[in-house]
Amino acid sequence: MAIVNGAVGKPQHISDMVDSTKMNGNQSQDTAGRADTPVSNGGQDYLHVFDSRTCNIHHIPVSDGFVRGSDLSTIAAPLKGSSGRMQKLAVLDPGFQHTACKESSITFIDGEKGELRYRGVRIEDLFHDHDFDSTLHLLVWGRLPTKEEKIKFERRMFEVASPPQEVCDVIRKLPKNMDFISMFLTGLSTYMGTDEEMTRSRHQAVMTYHKNLQTTDDAIIRCFSYVSATLATVYCHVKGVELHHPQEGLTLVENFLHMIGMEDPDKKISRTIDRLSINMADHELSCSTAAFLHVASSLTDPMTCLLTAISAASGPLHGGALEVCYQGLELIGSVDNVPAYIAAVKAKKFRLFGYGHRVYKIQDPRAALTKELMEEHREAIDANPLLQIAVEIDRQANTDPYFVERKLKLNADFYGCFIYIALGIPRDMIPGLLTISRMGGLMAHWREAMNNPIKIWRPMQKFKL
């Protein structure tokens, strides 16, 4: 099969695409045409595809660099070993590296330029000029809130911010040395069980959330508070400290810090977590967001989807990378061991967490903002003995041809742990805080899905003997 790019222009013959002696007047189906058929673009771009199996030419519309899978599936050829049965063309794309499964108006990324925007607003502008609650509002409802809208938004989160007794009782029965994410998921599962609307939605034919934005918006507010309150409850249980009641008039992050009893008189801690959270609020269809939406396509409740997303994010190749990156620095032990470690990475014996990203071909814009935050906490971060190891890895990887030629640059995970630890946040609680960070993007994608036609996500596979 040969593919030739079609450009907008004059009507053209494409008989020179193939050896005319091979055509033999064969007709193709659907979008197909003969080699001697002129193609009028009429302002539309096409791929002109010659199928050597059938000697047919197909004209596949191209829109903004994408072709639709349904258009490709109009290309068919006899199935080998069958008596004339036709097999539609499909795409094999392990890891979804070249496949878009949805259209979205939420987040834009240009990996070649290192550009990230939420609803058209540059990540740098949000980081410097707005807080996390405003960013949540922007992501979910498509605009930065007015002062009145922000007050109302924060009040609504406060009204559902106290965890029910059932949640507290379940969490307090868990061993304090249990894996933090396991405790977090247990608490959230219990919280979900206390929400009658969500549990009822799984057992009725009438769709609770789809095309019902008021119900969807109310559920989004509850989800924000459920996650924050559960994380605070788990933290207080592990640390053996009192869980404080939420306080009206505080932001989501400020209330979380208040509930765990962390003193923040000058709001330096909350403002830092706010900006770290803005940095991680959404990233198109990350692994966890895709997992969330995969489950959401069955029209279950948002907390069920969220449990799936948190589980996906806990893996070392995704949200767990921040913690694993820090553990890697501990294993290296000293600056003197960095050259040997870099050599082992190049020999593919180890993975260098915190470097490289599937999307970005230059430095992740979030990494630059993380470095900026580090300067505000320089004294506490400099006291961390692992920092010099990280700096030396960064220096060597940034100049080594192996990394440069492969366009492997610093990403948002590499230095993130240093800031959380400098703030006094326990390392095992960082994945939970990252969940709060990602809530805006997850809820925005869910709301977008609930407002659009639904098809259950059911990828194909290629059977292999």
Curated annotation (Swiss-Prot):
Q: What does the entry list under GO cellular component?
A: mitochondrial matrix
- Region spans: Disordered: 13-40
Q: Name one GO biological process term.
A: carbohydrate metabolic process
Reply yes or no: does the keyword Manganese apply.
no
Comp. bias regions, Polar residues: 21-31
Q: Which domain of life is it from?
A: Eukaryota
Keywords annotated in UniProt: Transferase
SUPFAM superfamilies the UniProt entry points to: Citrate synthase
The entry's active site is: 357, 413
Gene3D superfamilies, per database record: Citrate Synthase, domain 1, Cytochrome P450-Terp, domain 2
Q: In which pathway does it act?
A: Secondary metabolite biosynthesis
EC numbers, comma separated: 2.3.3.-
Name a GO molecular-function annotation: citrate (Si)-synthase activity
**Induction cue:** Expression is induced on squalestatin S1-producing YMG medium.
Please explain the role this protein plays, according to its UniProt record: Citrate synthase-like protein; part of the gene cluster that mediates the biosynthesis of squalestatin S1 (SQS1, also known as zaragozic acid A), a heavily oxidized fungal polyketide that offers potent cholesterol lowering activity by targeting squalene synthase (SS). SQS1 is composed of a 2,8-dioxobicyclic[3.2.1]octane-3,4,5-tricarboxyclic acid core that is connected to two lipophilic polyketide arms.
| Listed name of the protein | Citrate synthase-like protein
What is the source species?
Answer: Phoma sp. (strain ATCC 20986 / MF5453)
